[in-house]
Design a protein with these regions (language model features):
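Disulfide-rich, cysteine-dense extracellular ectodomains and adjacent flexible linkers of secreted
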Residues: 1-339
Length: 339
């Protein structure tokens, strides 16, 4: 009909409807096996994995809190920051304030459970002065016969004495075993949590390669700016944590806009995992979205509750009054009839 809008929901061949469903276009996402719409995949190929928003990625790890199940990225248990597979005992790393306890020390790749972070004067720890990834670990044990190994107090037996040189006060003064480095009074292994999130190689008990790309200063790894997983120097991001994208060497939240060399990058509301757009211009590619949580103290929420509560209360009151009136009239006429 003349003047009516054209709607396209089915296309021929491999073309798909564009976002506005006004035309058929070639799917713009690379590595797709089946495309639902212009920017939405139904399946991925070439060893890629499908995200919840229909994008194709080379690893589910970059989503943060997802694991690969076949060719699909699936959500880890809420207890985990990352995981090997489904289950609260399959965590590979933990959210801030929680620490990883491996299910089996002989199979650390299988993961473990996230438990409470270090608390002073608990579990043999006198001081929780080591902080890694937003979680606290023991830096000094309560008794001089124990030392912090991987952030937990352990008896300094003959076997562990080969790992840590005790300072005689419940902490380590040096790490002597291969693969261990000294950090805040404890010895940490480079191939397991929490040490691997700080340091990937060591020499002589000191870190030589920082996990965040920084150059260690006498064995100590400088921190990166907020939102950065890797950086060069104290202010230049080279890679971002899940929930951020790279713009002008800074990490910006997926939901926020930014300017990159004169180009505008537009964030996506409620997006919690993303990457910067092609050519660093346009809208970010969002991997995961999350509905905003409802704040029970929000006045609008309370008003809604009060309105619905008031309506319910008024309705009940009307029913009671009408019922009472009908009952009274019935009694009145019955009594008068008898009289």
């Amino acid at each position: 009909m003349s003047g009516s809008a054209v709607t396209c929901d089915t296309c021929t061949g491999t073309n798909k409807p564009n976002t506005a469903e006004t035309a058929c276009v070639v799917c713009s996402i690379t590595d797709y096996a089946n495309c639902d719409k212009e920017n939405v995949c139904a399946a991925c190929d070439n060893g890629k994995y499908l995200t919840p928003t229909g994008q194709c990625v080379d690893s589910c790890d970059k989503l943060g809190g997802y694991y690969a199940d076949g060719n699909v990225c699936k959500r880890c248990s809420p207890e985990c920051a990352s995981c090997s597979t489904a289950g609260a005992d399959k965590c590979l790393s933990c959210p801030a304030g929680r620490v990883l306890k491996y299910t089996s020390e002989s199979d650390i790749n299988g993961g473990g459970s996230c438990v409470d972070e270090c608390k002073a004067n608990t579990d043999g720890c006198a001081d929780c002065g080591a902080t890694i990834g937003g979680s606290r670990y023991c830096s000094k044990c309560s008794t001089i016969t124990e030392v912090p190994i991987n952030g937990v107090c352990a008896s300094n037996t003959v076997s562990r004495a080969n790992i840590c040189t005790s300072d005689g006060k419940g902490a380590c003064s040096a790490c002597t075993a291969a693969g261990y480095f000294l950090l805040d009074g404890g010895c940490y292994k480079t191939d397991r949590q929490p040490g691997k999130s700080v340091c990937t190689t060591e020499s002589g008990g000191k870190c030589t390669t920082c996990a965040n790309g920084q150059v260690p200063n006498n064995g100590v790894c400088p921190t990166c700016p907020a939102g950065c997983s890797k950086c060069s120097g104290s202010s230049i991001c080279t890679a971002c944590l899940a929930g951020y994208y790279l713009s002008s060497s800074k990490s910006v939240k997926c939901s926020e806009n930014s300017t990159n060399g004169g180009n505008i990058i537009t964030g996506v509301p409620n997006c919690v995992s993303c990457k910067e757009p092609p050519a660093s211009s346009g809208t970010v590619t969002c991997y995961v979205t999350q509905e905003p949580s409802v704040n029970p103290t929000d006045p609008s929420v309370n008003k809604g509750g009060l309105i619905s509560g008031a309506i319910t209360g008024i309705s009940i009151a009307v029913i009671v009054v009408v019922g009472g009136l009908v009952g009274f009239l019935c009694w009145w006429f019955i009594c008068r009839g008898k009289a």
